[in-house]
């Protein structure tokens, strides 16, 4: 009988707590929710309600439960409960909105990976990814905004078009308030903490960080020890033998050119142009030119362009990093939210998923570009010419080498691109 009484008391306490809050697991996260209307009642009425529910519990336990009831709203404001309640409410609102529309880089593989990964966690929220070159989607966002049409919620891509377009137009929403999950919000989970591309540190979140091998050579035409510094590119032997992805257009050719402008200066680039550079915009043709020995050294192409030639056993290899270094990048791993997002809650859910461990595993796996998350393996990307910054750099060195922040774009890349037009047009 005594055991039965203890069991009843235990069940009674659980019943009251469950009636007031309710416990549920949403997307692998335990959340608490109210299951009674959020109405104000007197303490007396609340006590009577509790007394009826508890039906004869001892005074100490009864008044403990009164305290629990009275202070429940305060408990909901504690850090742990607050984010759980916010996450639950956001998911419910996102499900009512039904979908989130995301502008992404031009990759069918990424589109499939994002849509499948997100749907697995949130089957009641449709994630529509629209792949295109960053500038194309951003131009569409601009045109639709002028016409009062707001289709996109989130944009993921390189920073140039964002910094020169969306940011000054005032179309972006601060992103930090949208971070809800502790694993996303806590800086300790990210190499370098939270890194932003915009000067205000609010709008453009850089979730990738890596070095890209964009210097390649033909092993039959050049020995790697012959190029230990960028100054060695000015040797007479290499005149007419260096090709470069046209630095007048956005891409890794322009990024490398800008890095040279930064570390070697304008006079150096003038001398480099006098080396009779082989200019090209067709990456396949440039890769063939290096593979067949027409060019001895290539600037601006990545592993993926050379991949079929490497598989065929042709004599091309990445050049060891010159003593001045190579540029660091966040690549296409930058995310922003639009101020006019038609599905704000679904956007929050997507951003938190994207920046979670799972989301970053999906993005890095599809793009081969290393994340800054410390709990995601990125060592494997090195074999594809993408070297994770967290594996080889300090955050301080990354900031010295990076090429995608607002400051670098305005003070380095824009003037460097202008010089490219001046010298090469």
Where are these regions (language model features)?
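Extracytoplasmic ligand-binding site segments that recognize negatively charged/polar headgroups
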Residues: 101-116, 128-142, 150-287, 291
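Periplasmic-binding protein-like
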Residues: 269-273, 278-280, 313-341
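N-terminal secretory signal peptides that target proteins for export/translocation
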Residues: 1-53
């Amino acid at each position: 009988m005594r055991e039965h009484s203890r069991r009843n008391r235990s069940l009674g306490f659980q019943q009251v707590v469950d009636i007031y809050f309710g416990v549920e697991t949403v997307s692998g996260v335990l959340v608490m929710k109210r299951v009674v209307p959020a109405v104000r009642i007197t303490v007396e009425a609340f006590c009577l309600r509790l007394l009826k529910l508890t039906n004869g519990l001892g005074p100490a336990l009864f008044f403990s439960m009164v305290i629990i009831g009275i202070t429940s709203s305060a408990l909901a404001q504690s850090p742990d409960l607050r984010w759980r309640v916010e996450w639950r409410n956001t998911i419910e609102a996102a499900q009512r909105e039904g979908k989130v529309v995301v502008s992404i880089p031009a990759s069918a593989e990424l589109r499939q990976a994002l849509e499948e990964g997100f749907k697995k966690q949130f089957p009641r929220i449709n994630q529509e990814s629209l792949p295109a070159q960053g500038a194309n989607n951003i131009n569409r966002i601009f045109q639709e905004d002028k016409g009062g049409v707001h289709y996109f919620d989130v944009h993921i891509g390189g920073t140039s078009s964002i910094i020169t377009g969306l940011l000054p137009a005032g179309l972006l929403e601060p992103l930090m308030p949208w971070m809800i999950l502790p694993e996303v919000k806590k800086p300790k989970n990210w190499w370098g903490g939270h890194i932003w591309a915009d000067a205000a540190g609010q709008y453009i979140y850089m979730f990738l960080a890596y070095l890209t091998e964009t210097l390649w050579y033909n092993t039959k035409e050049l020995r790697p020890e012959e190029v230990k510094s960028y100054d060695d590119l000015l040797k007479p032997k290499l005149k007419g033998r260096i090709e470069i992805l046209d630095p007048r257009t956005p891409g890794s050719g322009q990024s490398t050119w800008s890095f040279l402008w930064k570390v070697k200066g304008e006079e150096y680039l003038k001398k480099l142009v006098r080396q009779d550079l082989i200019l090209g915009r067709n990456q396949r043709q440039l890769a063939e030119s290096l593979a067949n020995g027409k060019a001895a050294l290539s600037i601006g192409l990545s592993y993926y362009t050379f991949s079929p030639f490497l598989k065929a056993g042709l004599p091309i290899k990445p050049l060891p990093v010159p003593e001045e270094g190579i540029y660091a990048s966040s690549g296409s791993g930058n995310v922003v939210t639009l101020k006019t997002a038609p599905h704000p809650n679904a956007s929050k859910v997507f951003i938190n998923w994207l920046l979670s461990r799972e989301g970053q595993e999906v993005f890095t796996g599809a793009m081969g570009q290393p994340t800054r998350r410390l709990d995601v393996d990125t060592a494997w990307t090195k074999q594809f010419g993408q070297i994770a910054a967290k594996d080889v750099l300090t955050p301080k060195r990354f900031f010295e080498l990076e090429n995608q922040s607002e400051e670098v774009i305005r003070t380095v890349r824009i003037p460097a691109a202008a010089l490219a037009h001046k010298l090469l047009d």
